[in-house]
Amino acid sequence: MLCGRFAPTPSGALHLGNARTALLAWLHARRAGGRFILRIEDIDRARSRPHLAEQAIADLRWLGLDWDEGPDVGGPHGPYCQSEREELYRDALARLQAEGRLYPCYCSRAQLMAIASAPHGLTSEGPAYPGTCRRLTPEERRAREADGKTPSLRFALPDEEIAFTDLIAGPQRFPPGAGGDFVVLRADGVIGYQLAVVVDDALMGVTHVLRGGDLLDSTPRQILLYRALGRPVPAFGHLPLLLGPDGARLAKRHGAVTLAGIRAAGTSPETVVGHLAYLSGLVDQPEPVRPEELIPVFDLARIPREPVRIPAETIAALSGGTA
């Protein structure tokens, strides 16, 4: 059975781009008669705010979405908040370490920033790590440990190309070493995003991941982790981003683009869903509609392949103006 999910990070309020991703992931699962899971990705507790997790649940319910498993309804694969799943991540870390797939990295933030400022040093996933600490001898590692430096742990990329067919973006091919060895455990003890999301999706039985196109470059790293952990690799679909009228990523300067702000303006959820469906190519006019009414017309082939700008008049209408 197909299983999809939506996994917001509670470091900010859900905006229209998040809502579109949630809606399309939900429709994809429901169209196939599958399961849908809500998970809260609050692994970085310093950046996460519990009230924003509660607000996200309320916003999604208001929009008309439901889920078979989640933090508010429970289910057989809980807990559904990453902050409560650390033991599972530690187990995965131990397995990877025992198989020699990880190594300690002692590079400072300043050194990593220097890498980022070098030509071709920055990828969409951050600085492309050149493998500095991967080449350290045992003696050099002991010397750094003696200096009291707490290392992060990096996953050593194997020398292999990663190719897959994205459900939306089509065939993808990444050369060996793309993006560089990545962190799976930060020096401050926080589990890396790449590992946490793979462990969660694997243990929750997620078969299809629909998410924003900004995460496309994460996919080869996650595929390697699935393989290293002996888990099936899900199908991935990366949605072109929803942008502001100026072509920039959605931000406060674009107006009331959060669901909380739109709700406060008195806009109906059906109006929001109608506009999101229109911007996603599912309907011909941005007319009010409930999510369940879109299930029969949902088709991944109808989704635009390029980023979509929200017209200024649409934002004005959702903010309480006239359409």
Swiss-Prot record:
UniProt cross-references to HAMAP family, sorted A to Z: Glu_Q_tRNA_synth
Residue interval(s) of motif 'HIGH' region: 8-18
Family, per entry: Belongs to the class-I aminoacyl-tRNA synthetase family. GluQ subfamily.
InterPro entries hit by this protein: aa-tRNA-synth_I_CS, Glu-Q_tRNA(Asp)_Synthase, Glu/Gln-tRNA-synth, Glu/Gln-tRNA-synth_Ib_cat-dom, GluQ/Sye, Rossmann-like_a/b/a_fold
Single Gene Ontology MF annotation: glutamate-tRNA ligase activity
Keywords: Aminoacyl-tRNA synthetase, ATP-binding, Ligase, Metal-binding, Nucleotide-binding, Zinc
Cofactors named for this entry: Zn(2+)
One of the GO biological process terms: tRNA modification
The name this protein goes by in its record: Glutamyl-Q tRNA(Asp) synthetase
Binding site for Zn(2+): 105, 107, 129, 133
Gene this protein is translated from: gluQ
Species: Symbiobacterium thermophilum (strain DSM 24528 / JCM 14929 / IAM 14863 / T)
Phylogenetic placement of the source organism: Bacteria, Bacillati, Bacillota, Clostridia, Eubacteriales
Pfam family, one: tRNA-synt_1c
One Gene Ontology term, aspect cellular component: cytosol
Binding-site list for L-glutamate: 5-9, 41, 193, 211
Enzyme class: ligase
The record's free-text note on cofactor binding: Binds 1 zinc ion per subunit.
Residues spanned by motif 'KMSKS' region: 249-253
Binding site for ATP: 252
E.C. number: 6.1.1.-
Function: Catalyzes the tRNA-independent activation of glutamate in presence of ATP and the subsequent transfer of glutamate onto a tRNA(Asp). Glutamate is transferred on the 2-amino-5-(4,5-dihydroxy-2-cyclopenten-1-yl) moiety of the queuosine in the wobble position of the QUC anticodon.
